[in-house]
């Protein structure tokens, strides 16, 4: 199973997180399948590769709690619903 989760980067006391698609059995710092964005909690910046995120969500990837909140704030799930309506 694939999850969308945060992978810690940066230095001490200055964490930046990459949002990655990764196998559930891998460690947090393990090898990821694909980088799909990043999140900087200090500067409150977020970059998301929305088409790639939508691809993984359509294939059944599950976001973790924090990633779910980030995607919800960016209104990614609305785009997912629009894409599903178009395909029906």
Curated annotation (Swiss-Prot):
| UniProt keyword list | Chloroplast, Plastid, Ribonucleoprotein, Ribosomal protein
Q: Which NCBIfam families match?
A: S16
The family assignment reads:
Belongs to the bacterial ribosomal protein bS16 family.
Organism of origin:
Calycanthus floridus var. glaucus (Eastern sweetshrub)
Q: List the disulfide bonds.
A: none
GO molecular function of the protein, one example? Answer: structural constituent of ribosome
Pfam families membership: Ribosomal_S16
Q: Which compartments does it reside in? A: Plastid, Chloroplast
Recorded protein name is Small ribosomal subunit protein bS16c
- The protein's gene is named rps16
Q: Which residues form a coiled coil?
A: none
One Gene Ontology term from the biological process aspect of the record: mitochondrial translation
Q: Which GO terms describe its cellular component?
A: chloroplast; mitochondrion; small ribosomal subunit
């Amino acid at each position: 199973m694939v999850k969308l989760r945060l992978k810690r980067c940066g230095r001490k006391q200055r964490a930046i997180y990459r949002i990655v698609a990764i196998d559930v059995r891998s460690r947090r710092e393990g090898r990821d399948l694909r980088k799909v964005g990043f999140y900087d909690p200090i500067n409150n910046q977020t970059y998301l590769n929305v088409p790639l995120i939508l691809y993984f969500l359509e294939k059944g990837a599950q976001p973790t709690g924090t990633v779910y909140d980030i995607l919800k704030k960016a209104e990614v799930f609305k785009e997912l619903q629009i894409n599903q309506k178009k395909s029906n």
